[in-house]
Amino acid sequence: MAFNHKHLIDITEYSEEDIKLILETAKAFSEVNERAIKKVPTLKGKTIVNMFNEPSTRTRSSFELAEKRLSADSLNFGGSSTSTVKGESLVDTVETLNAYKIDCIVVRDKHAGAPYIVTQNSPASVICAGDGKHNHPTQALLDLYTIWEHKGDFHGLKAVSYTHLRAHE
């Protein structure tokens, strides 16, 4: 089965088969963490920008570490270190990134819909790493992965969601 999606913006855009493929791929890569040398050439030659315009510890460090272990070249910036503090718009920032011919932009922003705006203004793949209270598909996938690892299946399960969204206000 092939994965035919360019972006990861909203988990509801994916079929059950897509999600299973993502989880199975993650499991296959998880063994890299057990190696003495925790690096594979999967993304060698690819450039990823982590544009975190909202504070993040776990999500940002997880992306940065995964990119390094998959041999991607990455650029990390956001918030007060960008020209947005001088009034530059998200679209202007994305247009600058487009000039660098990057392959993927990981977006974390407090504004709902920001990752979607990036998809409309860049040829690069876009991954939503959270957009305020709106969406956090990578967290949803991590939660599903944990359930899948422990239960082996999602069918017939009831779930309660407790979040720390107040921290994102």
Predicted regions: what is each one?
Residues K46-I48, G156-A159:
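Nucleotide donor/acceptor-binding cores
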Residues I37, P41-W148:
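Phosphate/diphosphate ligand-binding glycine-rich loop within oxidoreductases
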Residues T163-E169:
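Conserved small/polar residues in nucleotide/adenosyl-binding loops
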Residues H150-G152:
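Glycine-rich helix-loop-beta junction characteristic of Rossmann-like nucleotide cofactor-binding loops
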Residues M1-I48, N53-S56, S61:
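Positively charged, low-complexity intrinsically disordered leader regions
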